């Protein structure tokens, strides 16, 4: 896999209560990934970038919500979420903390 593709597969960690519980209990990390990425690419990207052994990868395509402003209808984009189970107990707490800090600095909630 090329270096460009490797970096474009993983987008961001998905921070939620369910993701945090999965990380603590079943050693699973939840990531936002490219919509066209497959399980093999996701596993290879995580293994190479973070130097961990990947046990399994499960993916879900989250459908975008329909939104309305006045009489105008719009739709948010679909996105893909990957549940990556790691072989050993190694969770990226620093990555999730840095991501949250970056979002707060940029004004996101």
Swiss-Prot record:
Signal peptide: none annotated. One of its GO terms (biological process) is translation. GO terms for molecular function: rRNA binding; structural constituent of ribosome. One of its GO terms (cellular component) is ribonucleoprotein complex. InterPro entries: Nucleotide-bd_a/b_plait_sf, Ribosomal_uL23-like, Ribosomal_uL23/eL15/eS24_sf. Pfam families: Ribosomal_L23. Keywords: Ribonucleoprotein, Ribosomal protein, RNA-binding, rRNA-binding. It comes from the Bacteria. Disulfide bonds: none annotated. NCBIfam families: PRK05738.1-1, PRK05738.1-3, PRK05738.2-4. HAMAP family: Ribosomal_uL23_B. One of the early assembly proteins it binds 23S rRNA. One of the proteins that surrounds the polypeptide exit tunnel on the outside of the ribosome. Forms the main docking site for trigger factor binding to the ribosome. Belongs to the universal ribosomal protein uL23 family. Part of the 50S ribosomal subunit. Contacts protein L29, and trigger factor when it is bound to the ribosome. This is Large ribosomal subunit protein uL23. It comes from Haemophilus influenzae (strain PittEE). The lineage of its organism: Bacteria, Pseudomonadati, Pseudomonadota, Gammaproteobacteria, Pasteurellales.
